[in-house]
Amino acid sequence: ADQRFIWNSHALTELSQQPELSRFCLPMILGYVSVNSIKVNGKTLEYVLVSRRSIYRAGTRFNVRGLDLQGQAANFVETEQIVMHGSDVCSFVQTRGSIPLFWTQKANLKRLPNPVVMDIDHMQAFQKHFDQQVYVYGNQVIVNLINQDGPEQVLEKKLAQVVTNAQNENIRYEPFDFHKECKKMRWDRLSILMERLKPDMKKFGYFMELKGSVVKLQGGVFRTNCIDCLDRTNVVQSLIAKEILQEQLVKLGLLRSEKELQDQKAFDAIFKNVWADNADVISKEYAGTGALKTDFTRTGKRTLFGALMDGYNSVIRYVKNNFQDGSRQDAMDLFLGNYIVEENEGLTVKSPLESARDWKYYAVPVIFLVAFSMFMVSVLLPDEHLSEQMLYVLFWGMACFLTLATMLLFGAIFVDQPKLAQNKVKSD
C-alpha cells in the first residue's frame, strides 16, 4: 500500500513489525470512494471515483497551509477516476494540494484572514515537492485558481516567481482567476480554461488496459489548487475528468462521439452527483462543512439556492474554523503520531492541553455580554426622559462596539488553537 495514504499507519506500527501479525494489518484511507454500475447505450460499465488524502502535513483549514520543509503539501489529495467495462479498464489521476510555498493564514476571528507569505527561501521545498510529484505521476501542470488581486494576489505573484526561477521543464504553470473570470455567475467561461488545458490533456493521456494488455499510460497530472483546494478546485477537476471520460468511452466503443455523453442523462446525473459528493466529503475533512459551489457540479449551472447554501456553509465554516479546529487538529496529530504522549504526561509531566488561557479570553466576552444586555435593556424599556434613554443607548452601544473591536484586535487569543504538535514545533 502507498504509505502516503495509510491513515492508521501509526496505530499499526507495533503489529506491522511482527511478521506473524503483519498479515492482519488492514490499511485505511481517509477520503471518498464511489462505485456505480451504469448503462451506456445498453452496455453496462462500472464508474469508480477514489480520493485519498495524504497523511503528511494533515490538518484543518487554517492550521496547515502550504509546504513543510520536506516538501509535503497541506490538503494533498489524489483522485482517480476509473471506468471498467468487462475486462477493459481505463483510469485517470488528478491531484490537488495547497499552494506549494511557505505561507500561513491563521484564524483570527476575521471571516477570511489575510494569507502571509513567509520571508524565507521557498525554492528547496518547492523543488522537493515537485521532484516527488514528477517521480510518482510524471509531468505536472499547476492549475492555480486563486484571485490575482486582493489578499490572494501575494500568493499568485510569489508562486509565479518561484515556478519561473525553478526552470523545471517537467512543470507548466497555468494561472486562472476563477472569481474574476466567472463573476456574475458566468460559469460558462470555464470553457476558456478547458481550451487552454486541452493540449496537456492530449499530451498526458490516461491509463487504458484492453483484454489484459496495457495499451496506454498516463504521462502526467493536473495539480489543481485554489486557496483551500476545495470549492473552485473541485469544479475544475470535475470538468477535466469529464473531458477525459468522454474520450475514454469512445475508445472503449461505448460512445460514437465525445459529444454523445451529454445525451446519456442517467450517466450524466450520476457523474455530476458523484463529483459533488466527493467535493463535500473532502471539504468536510479539511474545512468542516460541505463544499461551496456544488450546485454547479450537480446541475451544470449556478443557482440562487446554491448561492444561499454557500452563504450558510460559509457561516458554519467560520464558527468551526475559529472555535473548534484547534481540537480537531490535535486529534489528527495524536492519531497520526505527530504528537507522542510522554510517560506520566498529565501526572508528573504537564500536558500541553493544560495550558492557561490569557485573561482577555474570559474578561472581554463577559464585558461584551454585560454591555449588550444593558444595550438591549436601554433600547426596549421605555423611559420618561428620551434624552436620558438615548444617552444610555449610545453609552452601552459604544461599549459593545469597543469590546468587539478589542476581540478582533486580539483575535488569535479567542480562537481555538491547536496545543499539541503545533506547539511542540514552535518550542523546538
Segments the model singles out, each with a brief description of its role:
Residues 220-239:
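A phosphate-binding catalytic loop at a beta-strand-loop-alpha-helix junction
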Residues 1-215, 244-428:
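Phosphoinositide system proteins, centered on phosphoinositide phosphatases
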